[in-house]
Amino acid sequence: MRVAFVHGRFPAGGAERITIDIARYLKGVGGYEIYVYATRIYENLLSDDIRNALTVRKIPSQAFSNRRTKEIERLIVQDGINVLVQVTKSIPDIDGIRRRTGCKAVVACHGEPLWQRHAIVHRRQKGFLRRIAWQLYNKRRFADGSLALQKAKERTMADYLNCDAYTVLCDSYRLELAESLGIHPGTSHIYAIENPERAVADICFDKENMILFCGRFENWSKRIDRLLRIWAKVQYELPDWKLVLVGNGPAEKMLRQMAQDLKLERISFEGHQTDVAKYYRKASVVALTSQTEGWPLTLSEAQAHGCIGVAFGCTSGVKEILSPDGECGFIVPPYDEDAYAETLLKVAALDEEQERMIRTKAVDKRLQYVPEVIAEKWRFLFETLLKK
């Protein structure tokens, strides 16, 4: 069987890492050839191991929508693709491509159901002219969230109708999405497949007093500004602790200035790092203060390294990873910054036995999402689609 995944950049982030894990497993199973169609390819990041697991082909940018769609269809025919996995959203005319080529189409949603409602509001505030339009007109239209939600439902329904399978990141999402779209979950083609998490060979339980954020500095979704305000609340009560932020992105300048304005102490901006494992190895706590998350890999990576995850329970995916609350991590009511600060103080005050128990349970929780288990779910989906 030949399967192709459509990405923007490759290999560049969490979704791309998941594709690589799936490809490695299916390569080992045998009978599969995996392709990646990507707009931007980072050749220096394509190790021999990755190249052995899959074949990467370049496609035009989304800015050239018609050219991109035609090239994808040409590659489907050329490579004899049986299943096309569209990461995050459908490509234009996917229904036509399905009819003309006989290829099965999958949409793999890597956010929470109807995640577009957050992006819609954010994009209407990007750029000088859009910000003016936002203040004069759109701010009132989108004030209560109902318009963004309606648009998100319309886009998701279009993606759902034009694919053979729509995957989400946990079973709670499957039920939530079916209800939102008015579809019976028992007859839908929505499938729940979690993100995989690799094993860590040598877990370090001798942690430093470090609270770690690791991710893209994109404040509309990650809301790192909340974490800085929370640190301002607890920094003097935790004099032997530090806050470390790993990553970069458009909000970095604003966040650095905010750290100065709040007079934050023992805070470090580490920038983009190719080796984030060294930070997880040392961190006692991994903190997430996001507005929205699908299945945050930073939390599952934290568990794999024996870190204690703390996050707002903004979505079912976050709750699934950290539950049971207080045993595999800590779930804070969204978006209560005072409660989050209290939770950090609570974690810092854990005795050695309590701390060890939580870290051990977190590591055990990760075993549910080993690449072999998750990739087997993908294999089952692909086999099911070809039988239809």
List where the protein language model places each region.
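Aromatic "clamp/platform" in nucleotide-sugar-dependent glycosyltransferases that forms part
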Residues: H272, Q291
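A short, active-site helix/loop in glycosyltransferases that binds the activated sugar's phosphate group
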Residues: S146-T187
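Conserved donor-binding/catalytic core segment of Leloir-type glycosyltransferases
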Residues: A4-V6, D202-K222, L228-W231
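A charged, aromatic-enriched C-terminal amphipathic alpha-helix characteristic of glycosyltransferases
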Residues: E352, R356-L386
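Short His-centered aromatic/hydrophobic patch
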Residues: Q86-P92, C109-E112
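Conserved acidic donor-binding segment of nucleotide-sugar-dependent glycosyltransferases
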Residues: S323-D338, K346-E352
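N-terminal strand-loop element at the rim of the active site
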Residues: F5-G13, T19, Y25-F64, Y173, ...
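Short hydrophobic beta-strand element within catalytic cores of glycosyltransferases
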Residues: I308-F312
